[in-house]
Amino acid sequence: MSDGKKHVVIIGGGITGLAAAFYMEKEIKEKNLPLELTLVEASPRVGGKIQTVKKDGYIIERGPDSFLERKKSAPQLVKDLGLEHLLVNNATGQSYVLVNRTLHPMPKGAVMGIPTKIAPFVSTGLFSLSGKARAAMDFILPASKTKDDQSLGEFFRRRVGDEVVENLIEPLLSGIYAGDIDKLSLMSTFPQFYQTEQKHRSLILGMKKTRPQGSGQQLTAKKQGQFQTLSTGLQTLVEEIEKQLKLTKVYKGTKVTKLSHSGSCYSLELDNGVTLDADSVIVTAPHKAAAGMLSELPAISHLKNMHSTSVANVALGFPEGSVQMEHEGTGFVISRNSDFAITACTWTNKKWPHAAPEGKTLLRAYVGKAGDESIVDLSDNDIINIVLEDLKKVMNINGEPEMTCVTRWHESMPQYHVGHKQRIKELREALASAYPGVYMTGASFEGVGIPDCIDQGKAAVSDALTYLFS
Protein backbone atom coordinates (compact mmCIF):
# COMPACT_ATOMS: atom_id res chain seq x y z
CA MET A 1 0.00 0.00 0.00
CA SER A 2 1.09 3.63 -0.49
CA ASP A 3 3.50 5.02 2.15
CA GLY A 4 3.57 1.64 3.84
CA LYS A 5 -0.03 2.03 4.96
CA LYS A 6 -2.38 -0.90 5.36
CA HIS A 7 -5.55 -0.89 3.27
CA VAL A 8 -9.01 -1.95 4.44
CA VAL A 9 -11.89 -2.32 1.98
CA ILE A 10 -15.49 -2.32 3.21
CA ILE A 11 -17.93 -3.95 0.79
CA GLY A 12 -21.48 -2.67 1.17
CA GLY A 13 -22.70 0.80 2.11
CA GLY A 14 -25.77 -0.07 4.16
CA ILE A 15 -25.84 0.96 7.81
CA THR A 16 -23.45 -1.88 8.78
CA GLY A 17 -20.83 -0.77 6.26
CA LEU A 18 -21.32 2.93 6.99
CA ALA A 19 -20.99 2.37 10.73
CA ALA A 20 -17.84 0.33 10.10
CA ALA A 21 -16.34 3.12 7.97
CA PHE A 22 -17.30 5.82 10.47
CA TYR A 23 -15.82 4.04 13.48
CA MET A 24 -12.76 2.89 11.52
CA GLU A 25 -12.03 6.53 10.65
CA LYS A 26 -12.48 7.43 14.32
CA GLU A 27 -9.82 4.83 15.25
CA ILE A 28 -7.46 6.06 12.52
CA LYS A 29 -7.71 9.66 13.78
CA GLU A 30 -7.52 8.90 17.50
CA LYS A 31 -4.64 6.41 17.25
CA ASN A 32 -2.90 7.86 14.18
CA LEU A 33 -3.09 4.48 12.46
CA PRO A 34 -1.25 4.01 9.13
CA LEU A 35 -4.39 2.92 7.34
CA GLU A 36 -6.23 3.66 4.10
CA LEU A 37 -9.94 2.98 3.81
CA THR A 38 -12.20 2.29 0.83
CA LEU A 39 -15.94 1.60 0.73
CA VAL A 40 -17.59 -0.03 -2.30
CA GLU A 41 -21.38 0.13 -2.72
CA ALA A 42 -23.23 -1.59 -5.57
CA SER A 43 -26.19 0.81 -5.72
CA PRO A 44 -26.04 4.50 -6.71
CA ARG A 45 -26.56 5.59 -3.09
CA VAL A 46 -25.40 4.50 0.35
CA GLY A 47 -27.74 3.72 3.22
CA GLY A 48 -29.26 0.43 2.12
CA LYS A 49 -32.84 0.15 3.33
CA ILE A 50 -32.65 3.43 5.24
CA GLN A 51 -34.35 5.80 2.84
CA THR A 52 -36.63 8.77 3.54
CA VAL A 53 -38.99 10.45 1.08
CA LYS A 54 -40.41 13.91 1.71
CA LYS A 55 -43.58 14.38 -0.28
CA ASP A 56 -46.32 17.02 0.05
CA GLY A 57 -45.22 17.77 3.61
CA TYR A 58 -45.19 14.11 4.66
CA ILE A 59 -42.03 12.38 5.91
CA ILE A 60 -42.13 8.79 4.66
CA GLU A 61 -39.69 6.07 5.64
CA ARG A 62 -39.32 3.53 2.85
CA GLY A 63 -37.42 1.16 5.14
CA PRO A 64 -37.09 1.09 8.94
CA ASP A 65 -38.81 3.97 10.72
CA SER A 66 -36.99 3.82 14.05
CA PHE A 67 -34.72 1.95 16.44
CA LEU A 68 -35.02 0.80 20.05
CA GLU A 69 -33.65 3.43 22.42
CA ARG A 70 -32.44 0.79 24.91
CA LYS A 71 -30.10 -0.70 22.28
CA LYS A 72 -27.45 1.93 22.88
CA SER A 73 -25.40 1.72 19.69
CA ALA A 74 -27.93 3.60 17.53
CA PRO A 75 -28.52 6.56 19.89
CA GLN A 76 -24.74 6.65 20.46
CA LEU A 77 -24.04 6.85 16.72
CA VAL A 78 -26.55 9.70 16.45
CA LYS A 79 -24.70 11.53 19.25
CA ASP A 80 -21.28 10.78 17.74
CA LEU A 81 -22.53 12.42 14.54
CA GLY A 82 -23.78 15.49 16.43
CA LEU A 83 -27.42 14.84 15.56
CA GLU A 84 -28.84 14.29 19.04
CA HIS A 85 -30.92 17.48 18.75
CA LEU A 86 -32.97 15.68 16.05
CA LEU A 87 -33.84 12.64 18.19
CA VAL A 88 -37.55 12.11 18.86
CA ASN A 89 -39.35 9.29 20.68
CA ASN A 90 -42.56 7.77 19.42
CA ALA A 91 -45.84 8.89 20.90
CA THR A 92 -47.39 6.01 22.80
CA GLY A 93 -50.85 4.65 22.35
CA GLN A 94 -52.80 1.44 22.26
CA SER A 95 -51.69 -1.14 19.71
CA TYR A 96 -53.98 -3.85 18.42
CA VAL A 97 -54.08 -7.33 16.95
CA LEU A 98 -56.54 -7.98 14.13
CA VAL A 99 -58.07 -11.46 14.22
CA ASN A 100 -60.60 -12.12 11.47
CA ARG A 101 -62.11 -8.62 11.21
CA THR A 102 -61.97 -7.60 14.86
CA LEU A 103 -59.33 -5.34 16.42
CA HIS A 104 -58.34 -6.54 19.88
CA PRO A 105 -56.23 -4.34 22.17
CA MET A 106 -52.80 -5.81 22.83
CA PRO A 107 -53.08 -7.29 26.35
CA LYS A 108 -51.30 -5.07 28.88
CA GLY A 109 -48.10 -6.60 30.15
CA ALA A 110 -47.53 -8.72 27.04
CA VAL A 111 -43.85 -8.94 26.11
CA MET A 112 -43.52 -10.12 22.52
CA GLY A 113 -46.87 -11.82 23.07
CA ILE A 114 -45.95 -13.52 26.36
CA PRO A 115 -48.26 -12.42 29.19
CA THR A 116 -46.64 -11.03 32.33
CA LYS A 117 -49.91 -9.77 33.80
CA ILE A 118 -52.65 -12.32 34.35
CA ALA A 119 -55.82 -10.16 34.50
CA PRO A 120 -55.49 -8.59 31.01
CA PHE A 121 -54.74 -12.01 29.55
CA VAL A 122 -57.80 -13.58 31.18
CA SER A 123 -60.12 -10.77 30.05
CA THR A 124 -58.92 -10.36 26.45
CA GLY A 125 -61.17 -11.43 23.60
CA LEU A 126 -58.14 -12.54 21.58
CA PHE A 127 -58.41 -16.14 22.75
CA SER A 128 -61.13 -18.65 23.52
CA LEU A 129 -61.52 -20.12 27.00
CA SER A 130 -59.81 -23.31 25.84
CA GLY A 131 -56.96 -21.25 24.33
CA LYS A 132 -56.43 -19.48 27.65
CA ALA A 133 -56.55 -22.77 29.53
CA ARG A 134 -53.92 -24.24 27.21
CA ALA A 135 -51.67 -21.22 27.72
CA ALA A 136 -52.00 -21.66 31.49
CA MET A 137 -50.36 -25.08 31.10
CA ASP A 138 -47.10 -23.14 30.90
CA PHE A 139 -47.26 -22.81 34.69
CA ILE A 140 -46.93 -26.58 35.18
CA LEU A 141 -45.10 -27.84 32.07
CA PRO A 142 -41.45 -28.80 32.61
CA ALA A 143 -38.68 -26.92 30.82
CA SER A 144 -37.81 -28.41 27.46
CA LYS A 145 -34.81 -30.68 27.08
CA THR A 146 -31.58 -28.94 26.14
CA LYS A 147 -31.47 -28.34 22.38
CA ASP A 148 -28.98 -26.59 20.12
CA ASP A 149 -31.83 -24.96 18.23
CA GLN A 150 -35.52 -25.23 17.39
CA SER A 151 -38.09 -23.13 15.57
CA LEU A 152 -39.91 -20.27 17.26
CA GLY A 153 -43.16 -22.05 16.46
CA GLU A 154 -42.10 -25.34 18.07
CA PHE A 155 -40.95 -23.59 21.23
CA PHE A 156 -43.96 -21.33 21.74
CA ARG A 157 -46.57 -23.91 20.73
CA ARG A 158 -45.17 -26.26 23.37
CA ARG A 159 -45.26 -23.54 26.04
CA VAL A 160 -48.58 -21.75 25.41
CA GLY A 161 -50.43 -23.63 22.65
CA ASP A 162 -51.47 -22.96 19.06
CA GLU A 163 -54.13 -20.31 19.66
CA VAL A 164 -51.93 -17.86 21.57
CA VAL A 165 -49.17 -18.42 19.03
CA GLU A 166 -51.36 -17.83 15.99
CA ASN A 167 -53.40 -14.91 17.36
CA LEU A 168 -50.68 -12.97 19.16
CA ILE A 169 -47.11 -14.26 19.11
CA GLU A 170 -46.89 -15.06 15.40
CA PRO A 171 -48.16 -11.65 14.16
CA LEU A 172 -45.66 -9.88 16.43
CA LEU A 173 -42.56 -12.02 15.92
CA SER A 174 -42.89 -12.95 12.26
CA GLY A 175 -43.51 -9.30 11.41
CA ILE A 176 -39.97 -8.43 12.45
CA TYR A 177 -38.45 -10.95 10.02
CA ALA A 178 -41.33 -11.34 7.51
CA GLY A 179 -40.79 -15.04 8.17
CA ASP A 180 -42.47 -18.31 9.02
CA ILE A 181 -42.18 -18.90 12.77
CA ASP A 182 -42.22 -22.65 12.19
CA LYS A 183 -38.92 -22.23 10.31
CA LEU A 184 -37.30 -19.27 12.07
CA SER A 185 -34.52 -20.14 14.51
CA LEU A 186 -35.21 -19.49 18.18
CA MET A 187 -31.51 -19.20 19.02
CA SER A 188 -30.82 -16.68 16.23
CA THR A 189 -33.83 -14.46 16.90
CA PHE A 190 -34.99 -14.59 20.53
CA PRO A 191 -32.62 -16.84 22.51
CA GLN A 192 -33.62 -15.01 25.71
CA PHE A 193 -36.96 -16.87 25.69
CA TYR A 194 -35.18 -20.23 25.72
CA GLN A 195 -32.80 -19.05 28.45
CA THR A 196 -35.75 -17.81 30.53
CA GLU A 197 -37.53 -21.15 30.20
CA GLN A 198 -34.40 -23.11 31.12
CA LYS A 199 -33.81 -20.96 34.21
CA HIS A 200 -37.38 -20.50 35.48
CA ARG A 201 -39.18 -23.50 33.88
CA SER A 202 -42.37 -21.48 33.29
CA LEU A 203 -41.90 -18.96 30.48
CA ILE A 204 -44.69 -16.71 31.81
CA LEU A 205 -43.34 -16.65 35.37
CA GLY A 206 -39.79 -16.22 34.10
CA MET A 207 -40.76 -13.26 31.91
CA LYS A 208 -42.65 -11.72 34.81
CA LYS A 209 -39.56 -11.98 37.04
CA THR A 210 -37.06 -10.72 34.49
CA ARG A 211 -39.16 -8.01 32.83
CA PRO A 212 -37.74 -4.53 33.54
CA GLN A 213 -40.11 -2.30 35.46
CA GLY A 214 -41.80 0.28 33.26
CA SER A 215 -41.20 -1.62 30.01
CA GLY A 216 -43.53 -2.88 27.35
CA GLN A 217 -47.21 -2.02 27.56
CA GLN A 218 -46.76 0.03 30.75
CA LEU A 219 -45.33 2.71 28.50
CA THR A 220 -48.78 3.31 27.04
CA ALA A 221 -49.48 5.54 30.03
CA LYS A 222 -46.49 7.72 29.16
CA LYS A 223 -46.20 10.25 26.39
CA GLN A 224 -42.83 8.96 25.17
CA GLY A 225 -42.24 5.50 23.80
CA GLN A 226 -39.24 3.21 23.61
CA PHE A 227 -38.47 3.84 19.93
CA GLN A 228 -36.48 6.73 18.50
CA THR A 229 -36.06 8.28 15.07
CA LEU A 230 -34.81 11.58 13.63
CA SER A 231 -37.30 14.39 13.14
CA THR A 232 -35.92 14.99 9.64
CA GLY A 233 -36.10 11.30 8.70
CA LEU A 234 -33.63 8.47 9.21
CA GLN A 235 -31.90 9.23 5.92
CA THR A 236 -30.32 12.19 7.73
CA LEU A 237 -28.27 9.61 9.66
CA VAL A 238 -26.95 8.15 6.41
CA GLU A 239 -26.26 11.53 4.83
CA GLU A 240 -24.37 12.76 7.88
CA ILE A 241 -22.16 9.66 8.03
CA GLU A 242 -21.34 10.06 4.34
CA LYS A 243 -20.60 13.75 4.86
CA GLN A 244 -18.25 13.02 7.77
CA LEU A 245 -16.27 10.28 5.98
CA LYS A 246 -13.19 12.38 5.22
CA LEU A 247 -10.59 9.59 4.92
CA THR A 248 -12.64 7.02 3.02
CA LYS A 249 -12.63 6.66 -0.75
CA VAL A 250 -16.20 5.75 -1.69
CA TYR A 251 -17.23 3.93 -4.87
CA LYS A 252 -20.98 4.02 -5.58
CA GLY A 253 -22.79 2.13 -8.33
CA THR A 254 -19.90 -0.34 -8.30
CA LYS A 255 -19.97 -4.07 -7.62
CA VAL A 256 -17.22 -6.33 -6.33
CA THR A 257 -17.29 -9.34 -8.64
CA LYS A 258 -14.52 -11.39 -7.06
CA LEU A 259 -12.41 -11.47 -3.92
CA SER A 260 -9.26 -13.59 -4.13
CA HIS A 261 -5.82 -14.10 -2.63
CA SER A 262 -3.02 -11.92 -3.99
CA GLY A 263 0.24 -12.84 -2.33
CA SER A 264 0.01 -11.90 1.34
CA CYS A 265 -3.06 -9.73 0.80
CA TYR A 266 -6.30 -9.75 -1.21
CA SER A 267 -7.40 -8.63 -4.65
CA LEU A 268 -10.89 -7.27 -5.30
CA GLU A 269 -12.14 -7.08 -8.87
CA LEU A 270 -14.73 -4.34 -9.45
CA ASP A 271 -17.21 -4.26 -12.32
CA ASN A 272 -15.82 -0.88 -13.47
CA GLY A 273 -12.51 -2.53 -14.38
CA VAL A 274 -10.65 -1.35 -11.27
CA THR A 275 -8.78 -3.86 -9.10
CA LEU A 276 -8.20 -3.04 -5.44
CA ASP A 277 -5.57 -4.60 -3.21
CA ALA A 278 -6.46 -4.94 0.46
CA ASP A 279 -4.84 -6.20 3.65
CA SER A 280 -8.23 -6.75 5.28
CA VAL A 281 -11.80 -6.81 3.94
CA ILE A 282 -15.09 -6.26 5.75
CA VAL A 283 -17.99 -7.70 3.74
CA THR A 284 -21.37 -6.22 4.73
CA ALA A 285 -23.18 -6.86 1.43
CA PRO A 286 -26.39 -8.96 1.33
CA HIS A 287 -25.61 -12.66 1.67
CA LYS A 288 -26.31 -13.62 -1.95
CA ALA A 289 -23.93 -10.92 -3.21
CA ALA A 290 -21.34 -11.91 -0.61
CA ALA A 291 -21.59 -15.55 -1.68
CA GLY A 292 -20.84 -14.59 -5.29
CA MET A 293 -17.55 -12.96 -4.31
CA LEU A 294 -16.18 -16.06 -2.57
CA SER A 295 -17.71 -18.84 -4.63
CA GLU A 296 -14.63 -21.06 -4.22
CA LEU A 297 -15.11 -21.37 -0.44
CA PRO A 298 -17.16 -24.57 0.21
CA ALA A 299 -18.82 -23.19 3.36
CA ILE A 300 -20.18 -20.25 1.35
CA SER A 301 -23.00 -22.62 0.35
CA HIS A 302 -24.61 -21.65 3.68
CA LEU A 303 -25.16 -18.18 2.24
CA LYS A 304 -26.13 -19.39 -1.22
CA ASN A 305 -28.89 -21.53 0.29
CA MET A 306 -30.18 -18.85 2.65
CA HIS A 307 -33.64 -17.58 1.71
CA SER A 308 -34.78 -13.95 1.73
CA THR A 309 -38.39 -12.76 1.74
CA SER A 310 -39.71 -9.98 -0.50
CA VAL A 311 -41.90 -7.32 1.12
CA ALA A 312 -43.45 -3.97 0.27
CA ASN A 313 -44.99 -1.10 2.17
CA VAL A 314 -47.50 1.55 1.18
CA ALA A 315 -47.76 5.04 2.66
CA LEU A 316 -51.14 6.73 2.23
CA GLY A 317 -51.88 10.36 3.07
CA PHE A 318 -55.41 11.71 3.62
CA PRO A 319 -57.11 14.85 4.88
CA GLU A 320 -57.80 14.15 8.56
CA GLY A 321 -61.57 13.97 8.18
CA SER A 322 -61.36 11.33 5.45
CA VAL A 323 -60.26 8.58 7.83
CA GLN A 324 -62.36 7.71 10.85
CA MET A 325 -61.13 5.10 13.28
CA GLU A 326 -63.31 3.41 15.83
CA HIS A 327 -60.24 2.81 17.99
CA GLU A 328 -57.61 5.25 19.23
CA GLY A 329 -54.08 3.96 18.91
CA THR A 330 -50.90 3.72 16.89
CA GLY A 331 -51.53 0.66 14.73
CA PHE A 332 -52.17 -3.04 14.48
CA VAL A 333 -50.67 -6.35 13.42
CA ILE A 334 -52.71 -9.05 11.71
CA SER A 335 -53.14 -12.73 12.48
CA ARG A 336 -52.05 -14.90 9.56
CA ASN A 337 -55.41 -16.71 9.84
CA SER A 338 -57.29 -13.52 8.93
CA ASP A 339 -58.40 -12.92 5.35
CA PHE A 340 -56.17 -9.90 4.75
CA ALA A 341 -53.34 -9.22 2.30
CA ILE A 342 -51.72 -6.66 4.59
CA THR A 343 -49.67 -7.92 7.53
CA ALA A 344 -49.72 -4.76 9.65
CA CYS A 345 -50.61 -1.09 9.59
CA THR A 346 -49.13 1.88 11.45
CA TRP A 347 -51.21 4.99 12.08
CA THR A 348 -48.06 6.98 11.47
CA ASN A 349 -49.40 10.44 12.29
CA LYS A 350 -50.36 9.09 15.74
CA LYS A 351 -47.07 7.28 16.37
CA TRP A 352 -44.82 9.93 14.79
CA PRO A 353 -46.72 13.26 14.79
CA HIS A 354 -43.84 15.05 13.05
CA ALA A 355 -44.25 12.82 9.96
CA ALA A 356 -47.53 14.32 8.75
CA PRO A 357 -48.63 17.93 8.18
CA GLU A 358 -51.18 19.44 10.56
CA GLY A 359 -54.67 18.16 9.80
CA LYS A 360 -53.46 15.14 7.83
CA THR A 361 -53.62 11.39 8.43
CA LEU A 362 -50.68 9.19 7.37
CA LEU A 363 -51.10 5.42 7.24
CA ARG A 364 -48.36 2.91 6.47
CA ALA A 365 -49.41 -0.62 5.52
CA TYR A 366 -47.19 -3.64 4.97
CA VAL A 367 -47.58 -6.52 2.52
CA GLY A 368 -45.56 -9.63 1.70
CA LYS A 369 -44.69 -12.51 4.00
CA ALA A 370 -43.00 -15.89 3.85
CA GLY A 371 -44.97 -18.12 1.49
CA ASP A 372 -47.03 -15.23 0.10
CA GLU A 373 -44.77 -12.74 -1.67
CA SER A 374 -46.47 -12.45 -5.08
CA ILE A 375 -48.25 -9.21 -4.15
CA VAL A 376 -44.89 -7.43 -4.17
CA ASP A 377 -44.67 -7.89 -7.95
CA LEU A 378 -48.02 -6.26 -8.71
CA SER A 379 -48.28 -2.71 -10.07
CA ASP A 380 -48.38 0.26 -7.71
CA ASN A 381 -52.07 0.80 -8.43
CA ASP A 382 -52.94 -2.84 -7.77
CA ILE A 383 -51.04 -2.87 -4.47
CA ILE A 384 -52.66 0.42 -3.38
CA ASN A 385 -56.14 -0.88 -4.24
CA ILE A 386 -55.59 -4.13 -2.33
CA VAL A 387 -54.29 -2.22 0.70
CA LEU A 388 -57.21 0.23 0.62
CA GLU A 389 -59.70 -2.61 0.36
CA ASP A 390 -58.20 -4.21 3.48
CA LEU A 391 -58.03 -0.95 5.44
CA LYS A 392 -61.67 -0.18 4.68
CA LYS A 393 -62.62 -3.39 6.50
CA VAL A 394 -61.16 -1.91 9.67
CA MET A 395 -61.80 1.85 9.43
CA ASN A 396 -64.04 4.29 7.58
CA ILE A 397 -62.16 5.81 4.66
CA ASN A 398 -63.91 8.33 2.44
CA GLY A 399 -62.41 9.31 -0.89
CA GLU A 400 -59.02 8.55 -2.37
CA PRO A 401 -55.66 9.21 -0.72
CA GLU A 402 -54.11 12.55 -1.68
CA MET A 403 -50.61 11.07 -1.43
CA THR A 404 -49.32 7.55 -2.07
CA CYS A 405 -45.86 6.01 -1.94
CA VAL A 406 -45.20 2.33 -2.70
CA THR A 407 -41.85 0.79 -1.79
CA ARG A 408 -40.74 -2.71 -2.76
CA TRP A 409 -37.89 -4.58 -1.14
CA HIS A 410 -37.15 -7.67 -3.23
CA GLU A 411 -35.43 -10.53 -1.38
CA SER A 412 -34.58 -8.07 1.36
CA MET A 413 -35.47 -9.91 4.57
CA PRO A 414 -32.88 -12.62 5.37
CA GLN A 415 -34.45 -15.68 6.95
CA TYR A 416 -32.68 -17.07 10.01
CA HIS A 417 -33.95 -20.63 9.71
CA VAL A 418 -33.29 -23.30 12.34
CA GLY A 419 -29.55 -24.00 12.53
CA HIS A 420 -28.61 -20.50 11.32
CA LYS A 421 -26.26 -19.78 14.21
CA GLN A 422 -24.30 -23.00 13.65
CA ARG A 423 -24.10 -22.42 9.89
CA ILE A 424 -22.73 -18.90 10.39
CA LYS A 425 -20.21 -20.25 12.93
CA GLU A 426 -19.01 -22.85 10.40
CA LEU A 427 -18.76 -20.21 7.67
CA ARG A 428 -16.74 -17.83 9.83
CA GLU A 429 -14.39 -20.61 10.93
CA ALA A 430 -13.82 -21.57 7.30
CA LEU A 431 -13.31 -17.92 6.39
CA ALA A 432 -10.78 -17.38 9.19
CA SER A 433 -8.81 -20.39 7.98
CA ALA A 434 -8.89 -19.76 4.22
CA TYR A 435 -9.19 -15.95 4.17
CA PRO A 436 -7.66 -14.51 7.38
CA GLY A 437 -8.47 -10.83 7.69
CA VAL A 438 -11.74 -11.14 5.75
CA TYR A 439 -14.87 -10.61 7.86
CA MET A 440 -18.50 -11.13 6.85
CA THR A 441 -21.19 -9.38 8.81
CA GLY A 442 -24.47 -7.49 8.58
CA ALA A 443 -28.21 -8.12 8.56
CA SER A 444 -27.83 -11.62 7.11
CA PHE A 445 -25.79 -12.75 10.09
CA GLU A 446 -26.65 -11.55 13.60
CA GLY A 447 -29.64 -9.22 13.67
CA VAL A 448 -31.65 -7.12 11.24
CA GLY A 449 -32.37 -4.00 13.33
CA ILE A 450 -30.39 -0.78 12.96
CA PRO A 451 -28.61 -1.15 16.35
CA ASP A 452 -27.78 -4.81 15.56
CA CYS A 453 -26.19 -3.75 12.27
CA ILE A 454 -24.23 -0.92 13.91
CA ASP A 455 -22.94 -3.33 16.57
CA GLN A 456 -21.84 -5.78 13.88
CA GLY A 457 -20.04 -3.05 11.95
CA LYS A 458 -18.18 -1.93 15.07
CA ALA A 459 -17.24 -5.53 15.94
CA ALA A 460 -15.84 -6.04 12.43
CA VAL A 461 -13.71 -2.91 12.82
CA SER A 462 -12.31 -4.27 16.08
CA ASP A 463 -11.57 -7.65 14.44
CA ALA A 464 -9.87 -6.06 11.42
CA LEU A 465 -7.70 -3.75 13.52
CA THR A 466 -6.69 -6.60 15.82
CA TYR A 467 -5.72 -8.65 12.76
CA LEU A 468 -3.71 -5.82 11.19
CA PHE A 469 -1.95 -4.32 14.20
CA SER A 470 -1.70 -6.90 16.99
Swiss-Prot record:
Domain of life: Bacteria
Cofactor list: FAD
Gene Ontology biological-process entries: heme biosynthetic process
Effect recorded for residue 366 to E: Reduces protoporphyrinogen oxidation by 99%
Sites where the protein binds FAD: 12-17, 41-42, 49, 63-66, 256, 409, 448-450
Disruption phenotype: Mutations cause the accumulation of coproporphyrinogen III or coproporphyrin III in the growth medium and the accumulation of trace amounts of other porphyrinogens or porphyrins intracellularly.
EC number: 1.3.3.15
Reactions performed catalytically: coproporphyrinogen III + 3 O2 = coproporphyrin III + 3 H2O2
Main location: cytoplasm
Regulation: Only weakly inhibited by acifluorfen, in contrast to eukaryotic family members. Weakly inhibited by methylacifluorfen. Bilirubin, biliverdin and hemin are all competitive inhibitors.
Record membrane topology: Peripheral membrane protein
Pathway(s): Porphyrin-containing compound metabolism; protoheme biosynthesis
Gene3D superfamilies: FAD/NAD(P)-binding domain, protoporphyrinogen ix oxidase, domain 3, Protoporphyrinogen oxidase, mitochondrial, domain 2
UniProt pH dependence: Optimum pH is 8.7 (for protoporphyrinogen oxidation).
Any single Gene Ontology cellular-component annotation: plasma membrane
Subunit structure: Monomer.
Function: Involved in coproporphyrin-dependent heme b biosynthesis. Catalyzes the oxidation of coproporphyrinogen III to coproporphyrin III. Can also oxidize protoporphyrinogen IX to protoporphyrin-IX. The specific activity for the oxidation of coproporphyrinogen III is much higher than that for the oxidation of protoporphyrinogen IX. Can also oxidize mesoporphyrinogen IX, but not uroporphyrinogen III.
Family label: Belongs to the protoporphyrinogen/coproporphyrinogen oxidase family. Coproporphyrinogen III oxidase subfamily.
Protein name per Swiss-Prot or TrEMBL: Coproporphyrinogen III oxidase
